[in-house]
C-alpha cells in the first residue's frame, strides 16, 4: 500500500508542472470492447514502480457500469522475479471518443491516461499523458518488428516526448 500511495503522490506532483506542449494527439475513436484484453508492454517511460519490470502486461475488462477493471502485472527485476500486481480502475471521459480515461489508483483521485495511437487492427497502441512524463508502447503480442517499434518511437518524438527516456521492457514467454 505504501508503494501505491507513493506512486499516486508522484503522479499528482507531476501534474503540478506547467504545460508548454501543444495538446497531445489522441486516437479519434476507440471501440472499447475491442480494446479490452491483454496488452504486453513493449517499452515505456516508466513510473517508479515499473522500473526493472519484466513480462509486463496490462489487462482491461469492461465492467457493466462502464468503468474499466485494469490489472497490471509484471516480474520485478528479472523473468523469475517477484510477481507484482496493481489494479487501478479506468473511467472514460465523455466526448473523447473513448480515448481519454481517468485512471484511479487511490480513491478519489484519477490520473491522466490517453490512448494516443491505436492501429487499425487493434494490435498496437501508445498510452500517454498530457504532461509527457510517462508513456507506454503496448502490443497484443510480446514483441513487434523493430521497424514498427521505430515508427512508434518517431511518433512519440513528434509529440514532444523525450524518447531518450524510453526503455524496452523485457518479454520472455
What are the functions of these language-model segments?
Residues 1-5:
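Positively charged n-region of N-terminal signal peptides that target proteins for export
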Residues 16-173:
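A beta-rich soluble binding module of mature secreted/lumenal proteins
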Amino acid at each position: 500500500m505504501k508503494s501505491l500511495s507513493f506512486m499516486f503522490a508522484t503522479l499528482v506532483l507531476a501534474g503540478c508542472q506547467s504545460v508548454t506542449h501543444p495538446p497531445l494527439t489522441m486516437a479519434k475513436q476507440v471501440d472499447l470492447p475491442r480494446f479490452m484484453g491483454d496488452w504486453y508492454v513493449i517499452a515505456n517511460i516508466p513510473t517508479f514502480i515499473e522500473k526493472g519490470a519484466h513480462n509486463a502486461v496490462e489487462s482491461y475488462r469492461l465492467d457493466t457500469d462502464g468503468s474499466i477493471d485494469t490489472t497490471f502485472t509484471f516480474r520485478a527485476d528479472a523473468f523469475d522475479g517477484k510477481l507484482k500486481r496493481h489494479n487501478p480502475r479506468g473511467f472514460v471521459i465523455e466526448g473523447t471518443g473513448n480515448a481519454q480515461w481517468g485512471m484511479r489508483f487511490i480513491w478519489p483521485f484519477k490520473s491522466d491516461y490517453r490512448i494516443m495511437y491505436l492501429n487499425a487492427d487493434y494490435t498496437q497502441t501508445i498510452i500517454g499523458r498530457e504532461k509527457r512524463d510517462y508513456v507506454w508502447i503496448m502490443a497484443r503480442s510480446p514483441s513487434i518488428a523493430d521497424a514498427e517499434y521505430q515508427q512508434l518511437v518517431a511518433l512519440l518524438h513528434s509529440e514532444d516526448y523525450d524518447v531518450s527516456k524510453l526503455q524496452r521492457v523485457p518479454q520472455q514467454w
